[in-house]
Amino acid sequence: MSYNNGGYNNRNGGSYGGGYGGGGSRGGRDGYSGGGRGGGYGGGDRDQGGYRGGRFSGGGRGGGRFNDAPRQELTAPQWDLEQLPKFEKNFYSEHPDVAARSDRDIEQFRKENEMTVKGHDIPHPITTFDEAGFPDYVLQEVKDQGFPKPTPIQCQGWPMALSGRDMIGIAATGSGKTLSYCLPSIVHINAQPQLQYGDGPIVLVLAPTRELAVQIQTECSKFGKSSRIRNTCVYGGAPKGPQIRDLARGVEICIATPGRLIDMLEAGKTNLKRVTYLVLDEADRMLDMGFEPQIRKIVDQIRPDRQTLMWSATWPKEVQQLTRDYLNDPIQVTIGSLELAASHTITQLVEVIDEFSKRDRLVKHLESALNEKDNKILVFASTKRTCDEITTYLRSDGWPALAIHGDKEQNERDWVLDEFRKGKTSIMVATDVAARGIDVKGITHVINYDMPGNIEDYVHRIGRTGRGGASGTAISFFTEGNSKLGGDLCKIMREANQTVPPELQRFDRRSYGSHMRFGQGRGGRGGRGGRGGRGGRGGYGGGGGYRSTGGNSAPLGGNRRF
């Protein structure tokens, strides 16, 4: 959590919060731990068993239960725009160098950066940080980070966001989307009236996973410190108490996963009356994970004349419908093609094998990949159990592997990510859900131990490597059970100028008869594969294998592979 005490200065002068979070908030912590923590925490969101322990909604209060607090089902307010306080949202002033560029120059720049735009009166793209028009206090933070130049999505996204328009940004994961909305949000906040006691946030960022939410918070903290902008991260799987305390003190930015935020709203721990800048990050992922009802419930709580920014890696019809419902006359920028495609800097290798061969092939590829000591390998498995089993197997064989999946506690997930980021462990085994939104620099190899259920997830998975123009390698184990992916996988590989192995090409058939034939083949093999897999687990897992966090606690074998 990030909280800055002391005077808060906005762009128009004046101070806010001198002492507001000082002695009073310290007292709140003392009161909270004295009166509340005796009961302990009993989990996270409503579907995880609720919350036990001290109820906190102000300095020093304790006792009671979070679930004992009155809860009110959220209903959509009836908005009267005439009665709502006015607010500023257009802060863009075109730089003279940008204004001087010809239409031909702009068209050429967009073409070189695979940039397409849609809508009317779209601001011209910028090419340098100085052209973006950020105030000095924001610009200095950017320069201090040592970025050489804006990414393509930032070149077009910053002018769009600063103009106050509703906007859609479509670009691959790792393209710089977070800063595309984070920096304009700082300018937006500093132009708004100061928060008063009991006010909710000014900026709300919705994200699909806690890992992505924490990463966004890190960026907001880094670039908001010069303005003393306070933020909090509200997500499930962690105690509610610290999150409630941050909200009670007042934060300008709230980064949240949908389920936990609804918990807070229904319990009256915060409100969205002050939100004038709404961000939906990885909108496609949120919808894939079934968050659409929660998103709609949350957005209905926000004034309709807000500025809304939607960011997505893909453009499926579900995201388009959400856009039509909640964005007003939006402008859109797309980096790359709207057609699903893999990065051309990634070498894609597909091996058509059976289930029994996966472990041996995995070890062979690890031996090759870890010849370079700085390489990082991300291994994807289809289930939490498989994650732990692979990790246990690798560790028993001396490989420095750690697992991350949804059944692990947040502190263990954070630890695994930190070990992987810092290179203390070179192999991380993950499920799709656990890996969504994770941004780890320097991943050199992605191995699909199990293929994903759809081609979109395949592209997202392998996109963890080959970022920022660097090269990467994606290795996939394709079995008969993955035959429905065959045609789409061949198409993705050909588009990226990859060699499609002949064994995979035989699955590139879309007729009903072909699917029936492959389906019948899968049935017979599936039974034998299941029995063999269970036997393998019994052999190394020790009577039933490892559960939950067991894989990460398995000792490293004597044959150290690093």
UniProtKB/Swiss-Prot annotation:
InterPro entries associated with the record = DEAD/DEAH_box_helicase_dom (IPR011545), Helicase_ATP-bd (IPR014001), Helicase_C-like (IPR001650), P-loop_NTPase (IPR027417), RNA-helicase_DEAD-box_CS (IPR000629), RNA_helicase_DEAD_Q_motif (IPR014014)
Q: Where is this region: RNA-binding RGG-box?
A: 518-546
Q: What is the annotated quaternary arrangement, including any partners?
A: Associates with polysomes.
| Domain Helicase ATP-binding as annotated: residue spans | 158-333
Q: Where is the Helicase C-terminal domain?
A: 358-508
Q: Which reaction does it catalyse?
A: ATP + H2O = ADP + phosphate + H(+)
Segments for region (Disordered): 1-70, 500-562
The listed locations are: Cytoplasm; Nucleus
Residue span of motif Q motif: 127-155
Organism, as annotated: Candida albicans (strain SC5314 / ATCC MYA-2876)
Q: What is this protein called?
A: ATP-dependent RNA helicase DBP2
Primary localisation category: cytoplasm
Recorded hits in PANTHER family, A to Z, give: ATP-DEPENDENT RNA HELICASE DBP3 (PTHR47958)
Annotated GO CC locations: cytoplasm; nucleus; ribonucleoprotein complex
Q: Please indicate if the UniProt record lists Protein biosynthesis as a keyword.
A: no
Q: Could you tell me where the Gly residues compositional bias lies?
A: 14-43, 50-65, 520-548
The record's PROSITE patterns line, in alphabetical order, gives:
DEAD_ATP_HELICASE, HELICASE_ATP_BIND_1, HELICASE_CTER, Q_MOTIF
Provide the residue positions that the database annotates as binding ATP: A171, A172, T173, G174, S175, G176, K177, T178
Task: Cite the CDD domains for this sequence.
Answer: DEADc_DDX5_DDX17 (cd17966), SF2_C_DEAD (cd18787)
Q: What does this protein do?
A: ATP-dependent RNA helicase involved nonsense-mediated mRNA decay and ribosome biogenesis through rRNA processing.
Hey, which family's this protein in? Belongs to the DEAD box helicase family. DDX5/DBP2 subfamily.
Give one Pfam family, short name only.
Helicase_C
Q: Where is this motif: DEAD box?
A: 281-284
UniProt EC number: 3.6.4.13
What's the domain remark here?
The Q motif is unique to and characteristic of the DEAD box family of RNA helicases and controls ATP binding and hydrolysis.
Give the GO biological process terms: alternative mRNA splicing, via spliceosome; nuclear polyadenylation-dependent mRNA catabolic process; nuclear-transcribed mRNA catabolic process, nonsense-mediated decay; rRNA processing; termination of RNA polymerase II transcription
